[in-house]
Amino acid sequence: MTERIPLFEEDKDYIDEDHISEFAKALVWQDDYDYDANTTATTDITTTPINDEVPGIVSSLPSTNGNNKNKNKDINGTVSDSSSITDEDIMNSSYFDKPHSSTNLKSNSTKNDDDDDDDDDDLISRPQSGTTDNTSTTSLSSKRPDLITSKSDWFPIGGSRSSSSSKKGSSNYHKKTTPTSSTSTKSTIEILKNEFRNSSTYTLLRWPILIFVFSWIGILGIFYFMIRIYVAVSEYLFTWRGERKRLRNKLRNSKTYEEWINNALELDKFLKLDKWSENPKFSYYDYKTIKLTILKLQKLRHQGKLIELMVILQGCLKKNFAGIENRQLYSHRYYGTKNLVEEYYQEVVKCLELINQDNNNGDDNDDDDNDNEKIDIEKKWKFFKIVSKNYGKSALCLSGGACFAYTHFGIAKALLDQNLLPQIISGTSGGGLIAALLCTRTNEELKKLLVPQLARKITACEDPWYIWIPRFLKTGARFDAIDWARKSNFFTHGSTTFEEAFQRTGRKLNISTIPADPHSPVILCNDITSPHCIIWSTLLASSAVPGILNPVVLMMKNPINGKVIPFSLGSKWRDGSLRTDIPIEALNTYYNVNFTIVSQVNPHISLFFFAPKGTVGRPVTSSTRKTRSKQQYASFRGGFIATALEQLLRLEIKKWLQIIKSLDLLPHFLQQDWSNIWLQNFTGTITIWPKNKLSDFWYILSDPTEFRMKEIIEKGEKCMFPRLLFIKHRASIENVIEKGKKLTLTKYKQLKSGGVDCDEDVDVDVDIDDEEEEGESGGVVSDYDAQSFQKVVGWSNEDKKLLDELDNEDEEEDEEEEEVDVDDDDDDDDDSLSDSFEITTEHLKQRRNTIF
């Protein structure tokens, strides 16, 4: 028997029962929640507390009089513990049948100063003789606070809150109500009707059209998967045979990234894909501009002309400069890109490091063994701030996908091992759990946690069928929100807020949630939109898929006194993947993100991933005959006809889904527009599509074992290996820019403070002298200064002559390679068909450098 390997922090759960109790209270008694009890004790209006309605919740609440140190007793005198409260219990209608009491949540200061108010509260909570039910009801409803409630919060299948309260044994308040109070007791307003559905023709034709559309989509889907099967079979039978199949299997079985690189280079060499990197010409990027930029940067760097060097860098440090970040540059080899692209990234990093050198902080450095220009520290800081804004930032986006989301652990581990984990991470539904773990732990802690033993902490689906089936029948959801709140505390490091997570790790967490109202906008919870919101509550909301988990209330820490209260006045929220699985636009708005690494594991989306022109690190490989006949580096997957049919059928299916959404034909089951789940943008700059086996669907709602977790992590790592080179190139420039921005800002602050040393932990996002920045650029020439920019960056006659010489050299190399190809064709019997056609040298040269 193998020895049990301990997990880092395995004995810690970070559960705060006080916070869980506040969450349970806000979840059920949304209308009766006493905000004043958690903030101040000086209010003159008291609301109906729920101490006697749910035994045990108040036992964990903070109190000023100290009476809550002991466990609270219910009406029958039985001691109850807050840990026993579950979502199933609190949704039971029996809790609404007990009388209200308002004696336990009142502080001493309120009792001493407002005795008359206490007497009124006693009359409200305990109707005495001579007091009618209507009087009690009117008094109570007038004192309850006005809260914002969601329009479409769903309730247990047995009925809504109002229906359960009308049963025998309900309180007097629920039995007889005036029209005004009846409206206020509901946590949801009357469902709004769509005016466009009132048309008689809509009513008559809606279902026939919907049946026709779904039938046509089904037929298209059958043809679509026939095309996919044809492509897969043809690749298996005709493309991957013999030695190339052995090398590909060797590549797939690589255990480490270094081993994967060696195997990928071996496969590239066998397929002669390494020769593609030697030719700089390619139709998907402007190689002439890249060449000229490299020559100018090298010349200015050797001459030490830093001012002009900064001008050139301002022009080229921007998103996808000259097509340098086009995915096709990394989709023609298993490992590698154009040699010219490699040279560009290396040269830009050298130039940025030269500017970032500490040789110009105001004093002359006699020890410097170069003649570089001296640049004022303020100009350098402004330069790094400008290029940081132009270049943008990278972000890791983790999709939802139930238990398929555990593949994100392997994706994150591969990035972490190469020190490439971005500082901005977003997650939705299951991906939010992994994103929360990444943003609440340091790199050292993550290396100890991203191991197979982490499966011991994943117990969300541990309830057997004889527990969750009755729960589903009672509440309409398989899982219990309060139970999940406790289990998620380990991954969120307790009741950590978004702001606290950023302060602890420096990473910015983003979790996408949507209001239960189908028409309200999506909110991306982060340190900007909701800095004091508790992360585990947003995880529950982001996982609230209908039938899986009911909508929940977000919780936040009061920044004044640290008390836990509902966020957004008690509105309920649900799964963000229903509308925004990958919030690319919001990330760009908040953090200037323009390079996204998307890990997409949604099974209903990954089925339609095809990549007809190949993807990063996974080129489309031609058959053996075509590879030997001519150096064809680009081809459509399965051939042009198969690719055209696949694109046609997929876009046709998407068109009909868009028609269903535009005409609002689909029924809004549980008040949710389900047509959005196929019509979102599910991809990013780099998209990882882990392959799922058919057997994986059996575990879609089950907890992984340590053995399965090991397989899942390894699968995620292997999916990430082909993309790491592209990410490494992007991160090499981004990291140098951020380093220069941070160091120059520190020195700039020291200069502003008269040479006094500043703390090491400097907020690099703090703007200094905004008015000055908006004015003169401090000596850094702007891209929009036409004369200066043309003088420094413009193409002179010498540059054009140099480019012509380079083109002539490339043409000579192409002609030599083409002669070799023709000789090889004459010696190959399999190429007799191609020899029957006359192919001119000019045609070969043009064909060589295009994807088509």
Curated annotation (Swiss-Prot):
Bilayer topology: Single-pass membrane protein
Localization: Membrane
Biased composition (Polar residues): 75-95
Stored Pfam families: DUF3336, Patatin
Annotated Gene Ontology cellular component terms: membrane
Domain of life of the native organism: Eukaryota
GO MF annotation terms: triacylglycerol lipase activity
Keyword vocabulary terms for this entry: Hydrolase, Lipid degradation, Lipid metabolism, Membrane, Transmembrane, Transmembrane helix
Major site of localization recorded for this protein: membrane
Enzyme class: hydrolase
Segment forming the signal sequence: none
Composition bias, Acidic residues: 113-122, 805-833
Function: Probable lipid hydrolase.
Protein name: Patatin-like phospholipase domain-containing protein CaO19.1504
Native organism: Candida albicans (strain SC5314 / ATCC MYA-2876) (Yeast)
